[in-house]
């Protein structure tokens, strides 16, 4: 009886520790084509590119490569994207359906973190790119 209780305590404690390790960390999602993630990807890419000095065209999302989420007081979305300069000038309004990647534009791999609070308001926490 004592050894059974000890085993329950050991395995129960291990399960609690594993659960605590997951809390607060990012969890990978398998559905990169989910409309919510695509909307966030386009929001971050178009907003970020519009703020870059010297740019004349919006960047657009070519592909969502990876999605991770983290529950905080709201949700952090860490997205890894393939982006390229679009055919839409910054003087126009960005539209994900009409702002297609420029055929001659180099593609870059970017990672962005978007925070969405409990009221649904979103903001870009970071956006970093490297050559693809």
Swiss-Prot record:
Q: Which domain of life is it from?
A: Eukaryota
Instruction: Tell me the protein's name.
Output: Salivary cystatin-L2
Q: Which GO terms describe its cellular component?
A: cytoplasm; extracellular space; vesicle
Report the locations given in the UniProt record.
Secreted
Keywords attached to this Swiss-Prot or TrEMBL record, sorted alphabetically, are: Disulfide bond, Protease inhibitor, Secreted, Signal, Thiol protease inhibitor
SUPFAM superfamilies, per the entry: Cystatin/monellin
Spell out the family assignment given in the record's similarity comment: Belongs to the cystatin family.
Show where the Cystatin domain sits: 28-117
Where's it mainly located? secreted
Secretion signal span: 1-18
Instruction: Say which species the protein is native to.
Output: Ixodes scapularis (Black-legged tick)
Cystine connections: 88-99, 110-129
Question: What causes induction of this gene?
Answer: Strongly up-regulated in salivary gland during feeding.
Site annotation (Reactive site): which residues?
A: 24
Read off the CDD domains from this record. Answer: CY
Free-text tissue specificity from the UniProt record: Detected in salivary gland and midgut.
Q: What's in the misc comment field?
A: Decreases symptoms in mouse model of mannan-induced psoriasis-like inflammation by modulating immune responses. Vaccination of guinea pigs against the protein increases tick rejection during feeding, prolongs feeding times, reduces blood intake and induces visible inflammation at the bite site.
The membrane spanning regions, by residue number, are: none
Task: Provide the function of this protein.
Answer: Contributes to the suppression of the host's immune response to tick salivary proteins and is important for successful feeding on hosts. Inhibitor of cysteine proteinases. Inhibits host immune responses, probably via its inhibition of host cathepsins. Inhibits host papain (in vitro). Inhibits host cathepsin L (CTSL) (in vitro). Inhibits host cathepsin L2 (CTSV) (in vitro). Attenuates IFN-beta (IFNB1)-triggered JAK/STAT signaling pathway in mouse dendritic cells. (Microbial infection) Down-regulates TLR2-mediated host responses to infection by Borrelia burgdorferi and the production of chemokines CCL3 and CXCL10 by host dendritic cells. Enhances infection by the tick-transmitted pathogen B.burgdorferi (in vitro).
- Assembly mode: Monomer. Interacts (via loop 2) with mouse ANXA2; the interaction results in reduced activation of mouse NLRC4 inflammasome formation upon Anaplasma phagocytophilum infection.
* Consequence of gene loss (knockout): Combined, RNAi-mediated down-regulation of salivary cystatin-L and salivary cystatin-L2 in salivary glands strongly impairs the tick's ability to feed on hosts. About 40% of the ticks cannot feed and die. The remainder show much reduced blood intake, appear unhealthy and display strongly reduced egg laying. RNAi-treated ticks show an impaired ability to suppress the host's immune response to tick salivary proteins.
Q: Which GO terms describe its molecular function?
A: cysteine-type endopeptidase inhibitor activity
| Record region (Required for interaction with mouse ANXA2) | 87-131
